[in-house]
A protein has these predicted regions:
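Short helix-coil transition/hinge motifs at the ends and kinks of transmembrane helices
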Residues: 172-175, 194-195, 261-265
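Pocket-edge positions in alpha/beta enzyme catalytic cores
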Residues: 60, 72, 99, 142, ...
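N-terminal Rossmann-like NAD(P)+-binding domain of SDR-like oxidoreductases, especially those catalyzing
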Residues: 1-191
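C-terminal substrate-binding subdomain of Rossmann-fold SDR/epimerase-dehydratase oxidoreductases
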Residues: 208-349
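Short, basic/glycine-rich phosphate-binding loops at helix/coil junctions
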Residues: 190-192, 229-230
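Short-chain dehydrogenase/reductase
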Residues: 100, 148-156, 198, 202-206, ...
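Short acidic, glycine/proline-rich loop/turn micro-motifs
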Residues: 193-197, 236-237
Length: 349
């Protein structure tokens, strides 16, 4: 039985709620901090129902230092998983100050509170958007960073801050230095196979899979495919899609690594969480049509500025150091997305 307490920021969100379920099932005590701006409390009610266990919930913003300080004093977490943050690329271009204030300043406040409470184990929800353009479509952790939008830059800035924190602890030879895992997600999709929790975006979905699902169920009329002239096997963009349950298992493996003696004191390490292969937009549409029996109407549209032709992970480091790899395939992702969508056509409403 695991008696560790994990504080999860943004725990009511899409990835956060799935992480809370896996943590509870793995025996962790779970404390959630979420401002519910982009999430619904119903997700956590369902998580507790599925797990048959309770978690602690605090409605608070990570920028509220006093609220966080009080929560840390009361709950005494051992590790923090930091999901909280705004995540829409397009919105970040329109509202960069909001993204930097929420994501970067919010993380600064969180780490200040963690330092004061001497909680120095952190798993950070980073993103493949921190990478710059590369000659290779397969991205490894040592590749140069060069985010091209405010969302990606906010994640890259946070990575820099966390690396600086760990370096300062090594420099100052503090007794309990930071141990940090930066998990760079590729494209999380899917849902828990119960169909009780899943992705419930506000308004029009920004991501491909929930958009396709809403077209399939009739909520949206058709899908726009941005670009059909890329140098790829069918002309459409190729991305690395990862099942959300595989993704959150990576966080549990990361906590185990941080707890282990071999994870160096004061280390801050980045890991790609991806499948290591890509699917094109048309391949996603074809899989959805094949599995659901629904026709997905789509139209070809011009490329979006800044979109890469092809991008997928080299996940070898996560396998070697975290003992993590994906177990679910594209059919699982589509089946579980469709199961969630059909059982919850209005999301958590």
């Amino acid at each position: 039985m695991n008696h560790q307490t994990v504080l999860v920021t943004g725990g009511a969100g899409y990835i956060g709620s799935h992480a809370c379920l896996e943590l509870l099932q793995a025996g962790f005590k779970v404390v959630v901090v979420d401002n519910l701006v982009n999430s619904k409390l119903e997700s956590l009610a369902r998580v507790q129902q599925l797990a048959g266990k309770a978690l602690s919930f605090y409605q608070a913003d990570i920028r509220d230092k006093q609220a966080l300080t009080d929560i840390f004093a009361k709950e005494a977490p051992d590790t923090v998983i930091h999901f909280a943050g705004l995540k829409a690329v397009g919105e970040s271009c329109a509202l960069p100050q909001l993204y930097y204030h929420n994501n970067v300043y919010g993380t600064l406040v969180l780490t200040e509170v963690m330092s004061a409470a001497n909680v120095k184990q952190l798993v950070f929800s980073s993103s493949a958007t921190v990478y710059g353009e590369s000659a290779s479509p397969q991205y490894s952790e040592h590749f140069p960073l060069g985010a091209i939008n405010p969302y990606g830059r906010s994640k890259a800035m946070i990575e820099d801050i966390l690396r600086d924190l760990s370096a300062s602890d090594r420099l100052n030879k503090v007794e309990k230095p930071w141990k940090i895992a930066l998990l760079r997600y590729f494209n999380p999709i899917g849902a828990h196979d119960s169909g009780m929790i899943g992705e419930d975006p506000n308004g029009i979905p920004n991501n491909l899979m929930p958009y396709v699902a809403q077209v399939a169920i009739g909520k949206l009329a058709q899908l726009s495919v941005f670009g059909d002239d890329y140098p790829t096997r069918d002309g459409t963009g190729i991305r690395d899609y990862i099942h959300v349950v595989d993704l959150v298992q990576g966080h549990i493996k990361a906590i185990a690594a941080l707890n282990a003696e071999h994870f160096a004191e004061g280390a801050c390490k980045a890991y790609n969480l991806g499948a290591g292969r890509g699917y094109s937009v048309l391949e996603i549409i074809d899989a959805f049509q094949r599995i659901t029996g629904k026709i997905i109407p789509y139209q070809m549209s011009p490329r979006r500025t800044g979109d890469l032709a092809e991008c997928f992970a080299n996940p070898a480091l996560a396998l070697a150091e975290l003992n993590w790899q994906v177990e679910k395939d594209l059919d699982d992702m589509v089946n579980d997305t469709w199961n969630w969508q059909t059982k919850n056509p209005q999301g958590y409403q």
